[in-house]
Amino acid sequence: MSYTKFSKAVTKWLKANGLPCYGTAYDSPEETKARLDAWMRGSKEILRQWITDKRYRELISCAHGGWYQDSVIFEPLAEHFVAHHLFDELRFLCERGIRFSAEDMLATIKSEKEEHGTLDIETIRSIDVPSYVSGRSYSHLGEIAKYRKRALDQIIRYAGYLEQIHAPAEYLEQVNVLQESVSDLTIKTKDLRPFRFRL
C-alpha cells in the first residue's frame, strides 16, 4: 500500500516538473535512461519530503516491500534515523530483513537435514556465493550459504548503524551473539525472538 502511495507521489512530482514518467516498448535507450534518471530524481525528492513530514511508517513499509534497491530508500532512511537518534525506528526498519533472511536459512537447513540427515557446515562456508547465485544450479547447501551471507551482511550493516547511534550495550551484545550464531550456523528459531520489534 505504501509503495503505491510513494509511486503515485513520485509520478505526480514528475508530471508537475515536466519530467518523463511513462515509457513504452518503443522508447529508445536514451529515452528509457532519461525516464529512469527522472524517476530516481523524483524518488529522492519524495523520500526527502516524506522524511521531513515524518512519514516513517510508510517509508519503512516501502523499504520492507523490496520494490526499491536499498540505496534508494532503506539506507538514506537508516542514516536519517541514526543522525536523529531514532533507535526504535531503526530497529523496526532493520530487524525484519535480518529475521527473514535467518528464517529462510533455517527453513533450508531443516530441508537439508531432513533429506541428508546432517549438515556439511564446512562445505557451506566454502561456497562462493556470488558464483552460486549467478549460476543456474540449485542446491540446499548453496541456498543456505546465500541466506547466511545475506543475513550476515544485514547484521553487519545494522551493527554499524547501532554503534553510530550508541545503542544500549545489552542490545548490541544480542546482535553480536546473533551474528556469531548465523556465522557458525548454530542459530535456532528462538534466537530471533529479540528481533521482532514493531512501532
Q: Model segments located where?
A:
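Generic helix N-cap/helix-start motif at coil->alpha-helix transitions
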Residues: 29, 40, 67-75, 101-104, ...
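Acidic, low-complexity, intrinsically disordered interaction modules
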Residues: 63-67, 71-73, 97, 130-154
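Non-Sec secretion/translocation targeting segments of pathogen effectors
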Residues: 197-199
